[in-house]
Amino acid sequence: MSSPTNQVAPIPVGPDAVAAMSPSNYVTAQTLRDGDPAEREAVHLTSADDKFTVGSWRAEPYAEYIENYPGDEYTRVLEGSITLTGDDGVAHTFGPGDSFTLTKGWRGEYRVTEPLVKQFAIYVPGEART
């Protein structure tokens, strides 16, 4: 899905953001450690080569262990809370209004501690993002 050129499109927030979402499945049975994320997502922009995506994502509390994060991502938390604990044992917790980045190859626990709504922009080199 590529985006039209020369267009401006607002990105919904709050209840409108959640209403625009449909089911997604980034969390796999292999990575899931606890809970059921019941993920939902809305894609707002995809590059012509499908390697760069901007979207909104929602998840219920859950935890997963990620061996090799697939891309470079910027995230802004709109609602809820998330704790990221790298293999070095350092934990970072983010809540509404906080932003963070994850780099390709990151390893650690990705734990949603309160129902989460986030906006993200991710670049996944190599194969197109699915």
What label would you give each PLM region?
Residues 39, 52-54, 107, 117:
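Intrinsic-disorder/low-complexity, polar/charged segments enriched in Ser/Thr/Lys/Arg/Asp/Glu/Gln
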Residues 104-127:
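Ligand-binding loop in jelly-roll beta-barrel domains
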